[in-house]
From Swiss-Prot:
PANTHER family: TRIGGER FACTOR CHAPERONE AND PEPTIDYL-PROLYL CIS/TRANS ISOMERASE (PTHR30560), TRIGGER FACTOR-LIKE PROTEIN TIG, CHLOROPLASTIC (PTHR30560:SF3)
Coiled-coil intervals, chain numbering: none
Bias (Basic residues): 480-492
Species assigned in the record: Mesorhizobium japonicum (strain LMG 29417 / CECT 9101 / MAFF 303099) (Mesorhizobium loti (strain MAFF 303099))
Name of the protein in question: Trigger factor
Biological role: Involved in protein export. Acts as a chaperone by maintaining the newly synthesized protein in an open conformation. Functions as a peptidyl-prolyl cis-trans isomerase.
Subcellular location: Cytoplasm
InterPro entries reported in the protein's UniProt record: PPIase_dom_sf (IPR046357), PPIase_FKBP_dom (IPR001179), Trig_fac (IPR005215), Trigger_fac_C (IPR008880), Trigger_fac_C_sf (IPR037041), Trigger_fac_ribosome-bd_bac (IPR008881), Trigger_fac_ribosome-bd_sf (IPR036611), Trigger_fact/SurA_dom_sf (IPR027304)
Recorded domain comment: Consists of 3 domains; the N-terminus binds the ribosome, the middle domain has PPIase activity, while the C-terminus has intrinsic chaperone activity on its own.
Domain of life: Bacteria
GO biological process, one term: 'de novo' cotranslational protein folding
Keywords attached to this entry: Cell cycle, Cell division, Chaperone, Cytoplasm, Isomerase, Rotamase
Length: 492
């Protein structure tokens, strides 16, 4: 087998591989000899079929198997033998001339093919001692736990029907149909909708106009969708809702005790508080980690500047762009609504893709040098966590999909590996803990945001794409935005 380099430009490579006709013939004859004792051909005793007769019958199909074997087995070894790592699966280029292909299958000529690929650049790992990050720490006060426990208790609160007028805090059961300019709009209708007045679950002004109504009342509610409403075709428009009040209920006494916890399936109020505290600490801990990770990645980004494989960048960009356009479409928004243009957004997201690929290569090299791995046990735990995100009736199907799909498992392994590399780095760099308030921790850190973000990144439609690839900014938990309300839920 002869290997000749025909292109070496930047990260791009093309090599020509020539397998002499004699080598192809030897591989074919080995297959024919092996098949001689296995095939059954009328007129011949088992094991007595002449090789040349076998060649006449099976020669081309066996030679095709030889070709596939060479392509499958030699591609990786050839590139590894050159001391290179391919960024993606190499493109295999073979002759398109039918006569030439026939000669190869007949064993009458050398087999030539080309491999077209990009290499992973050599990355020299730098000293980490100069990297310094600040870790914001929020000590969750008891008052925070008390507030959340109260919200949990309120969600389980009982209501009793009443005959009087609805007041703030009462719950109403309503049917409604929303209209704009006299025409009903998609997602603007509901039946037997339970609504606690004052909960701000519906768009501003809706609940206020139902105060004072009684069961059996019909009420026309007029509201204006907020200018920043997620469904752009509804934003800023006035709408009327024909509402039928079917029932008014008053809340029962709010009790926060062991009995409340037992009604929620827990043994005691103390256990409920433990669970709530754990959830809150995990939430804020996740926010703390994402901010630390962002600082770390920003400094790594500044420290490493090299050409990244264009095909990896293209693949990453396509993933980001698909997510962004899906989110925009789902929200009924356009790039103009996001205060940008498609051209500007493409340029910004391309820079984001370049950054992600470059940082991914740096983290992979750091992890490899440090011996970071994801164990089978860790992958199994990650798989179970992923499967639990599916509806109960789909979990077994999802589990089988991951178990039988190596690419899906690798996609699950990659972010786990990245997080372990980040953990490794946090043990190597200077980390200073600073106690902050809840507001400081939850505040968007504009100064720390990467310059590779697109303008839509500050909008809801683009945030999912930012967080999806475990980049430097995770979507932080925020209070549900007022405009995103039930009255137009399906229209968003």
């Amino acid at each position: 087998m002869q290997v000749t380099e025909t292109l070496n430009s930047g990260l791009k490579r093309e090599i020509k591989i020539t397998v002499p006709a004699g080598d192809m013939e030897a591989k074919l004859m080995a297959r024919l000899s092996d098949a001689r004792n296995k095939v059954r051909i009328n007129g011949f005793r088992p094991g007595k079929v002449p090789v040349q007769h076998l060649r006449k019958v099976y020669g081309k199909s066996f030679m095709a198997e030889v070709v596939n074997e060479i392509l499958n087995d030699s591609t990786r070894s050839i590139i590894t033998g050159r001391g290179e790592k391919a960024a993606m699966q190499p493109e295999v280029i073979m002759t398109e001339d039918e006569k030439e292909a026939e000669k190869i299958l007949a064993g009458g000529t050398d087999f030539e093919f080309r491999l077209n690929y990009e290499v992973i650049p050599a990355i020299e790992i730098k000293d980490f001692s100069d990297i310094k990050v600040t870790r914001q720490v929020f000590d969750v006060p008891d008052a925070e736990i008390d507030d959340q426990v109260k919200r949990v208790a309120e969600s389980a609160r009982s209501y009793e029907p009443k005959t009087g007028k609805a007041a703030e805090g009462d719950r109403v059961s309503i049917d409604y149909v929303g209209k704009i300019d006299g025409e009903a709009f998609a997602g603007g209708a509901g039946t037997d909708q339970l609504l606690v007045l004052g909960s701000k679950e519906f768009i501003p002004g809706f609940e206020d106009q139902l105060i004072g109504t009684k069961a059996g009342d019909e009420k026309q509610v007029t509201v204006t969708f907020p200018e920043n409403y997620q469904a752009a075709h509804l934003a800023g428009k006035e709408a009327t809702f024909d509402v039928t009040v079917k029932e008014v209920s008053k809340p029962g006494e709010l009790e926060i005790n062991d009995e409340t916890a037992k009604n929620l399936g827990l043994e005691s109020l103390e256990r409920l508080r433990e669970i709530v505290r754990g959830q809150i600490e995990n939430q804020f801990g996740s926010m703390t980690r994402q901010k630390v990770k962002r600082q770390l990645l920003d400094q790594l980004d500044a420290a490493y500047s090299f050409e990244a494989p264009s095909k990896l960048i293209d693949a990453e960009f396509n993933n980001i762009w698909a997510q962004v356009t899906r989110d925009l479409e789902a929200a009924g928004r356009t790039f103009a609504d996001e205060e940008t243009t498609e051209e500007e957004a493409r340029a910004e997201y391309l820079r984001l893709a370049e950054r992600r690929v470059r940082l991914g290569l740096v983290l992979a090299e750091i992890g490899e040098k440090a011996g970071v791995t994801v164990s089978d046990e860790e992958l199994q735990r990650g798989l179970f966590e992923q499967v639990r995100r599916f509806p109960a009736n789909q979990q077994q199907e999802a589990f089988e999909f991951y178990r039988s799909n190596p690419e899906a498992l690798n996609a699950l392994r990659a972010p786990m590996f990245e997080e372990k590399v980040v953990d490794h780095l946090l043990g190597q760099i200077s980390v200073t803990d600073v106690k902050v308030s809840k507001e400081e921790l939850m505040a968007d850190d504009e100064d720390a945001e990467t310059t590779t973000k697109a303008k839509p990144a500050k909008k809801a439609a683009a945030k999912k794409a930012e967080a999806k690839a475990n980049e430097d900014e995770a979507e932080e938990p925020k209070k549900k935005a007022a405009p995103k309300k039930k009255a137009a839920k399906d229209a968003e």
